[in-house]
Amino acid sequence: MKGLTLACIAATVVAASHAMTTIIAPIAEISTTSSPSTTTINPLLQSRIDFEISRLTRRLERRIRGLQVGSGRLDRSITSLQRELDFNNAVLAQLPELIKNIMINNPTQRLSSRTVASIMRSVQNAATKASNEESAEVEDRRRRAIFEVTSSIVIVEGTTDSTTTTQIPEVTTQEVDTTTEMVTTAAPEQEVTSTATETTTEMTTQGTTLPSFLVSRINSVVSRIGRFFQRRIQRIQRSLSRLSRFRPLYSRLIDENTSALNNLPLLVRGLVTSPFQRRLRLSQVFRALRFRLTITTPSQPDVSPMSVRKRRQAESAEEDDDLVGDMEDLKELEQEIQEALEEVEKLDV
């Protein structure tokens, strides 16, 4: 009886041991593959992260290119406006003399602002052309002198050794008095009255006194066209002031988008917590960058995507667009720039 009991106990122990072995083995395998030293990201999550990085990279690159194009167009517009402002200031400064010279030859001609501007541009173009021709002539003389000096250098090859000697003839320079006597003739003083009602003031040109009716007409034309150019200058200055305010904004947006592009992989890894979550918006990436969130890789123990998400939602729960900071106003900004440019185009007389 005792032998039978011992046999039953032994069989029970063997069966229990076999059952424990079949249960413990898979657990041992699981614990081995999931040890902290060999933890790997879920392939689905990694694929989603790579997809978001690729998609947002393309969007950021397009946005940066668009901002750079807009910034370049803004700079060209400001340069063009500044050049136009300088021209109109020059016209306004020389307007009395210009009107007087025109009306002396054509007293009955009715002058318009377009005619005056066209004449002034012709004068400036002629002066620029003369200056360019003078510069080209000076450069041509310099090159000719260099050629004459270098062409007189004689190279003599030695016959006793392999050395080559260069003989440069002595160049003597003679001081030549290049001072040009300039004879200036003092032009008679020319006075233009500031109002059209003063007919007693005399205007002279080359010693000849102009009739009072011509003086009055000249003053009237100067006053009329001068007011037009003054209004034109004020409008250009207002447009310049409006456009100049956009320069730092464009620069800041380009810097912010470039920074987001450079840090995009790290930001996406911290924001993508599930392979099945909604697509990331650029606003989420920019908020993480703007608030200096510490986003690390998921394999490190200090990552807390839930706290990041809660903080992001607390900062801006209602913001649901793809804009960052002042990017919400980018369309309004571009519209304002377009209005300023259209206003400048209307300045053409």
UniProtKB/Swiss-Prot annotation:
GO terms for cellular component: extracellular region. Its main location: secreted. It is found in: Secreted. Residues 1-19 form the signal peptide. The keyword Coiled coil applies. Keywords: Coiled coil, Glycoprotein, Secreted, Signal. It comes from the Eukaryota. Component of the acid-insoluble and acid-soluble organic matrix of calcified layers of the shell (at protein level). Glycans are attached at N257. Residues 316-349 form a coiled coil. Residues 300-326 are annotated as: Disordered. Residues 316-326 have a biased composition (Acidic residues). This is Threonine-rich protein.
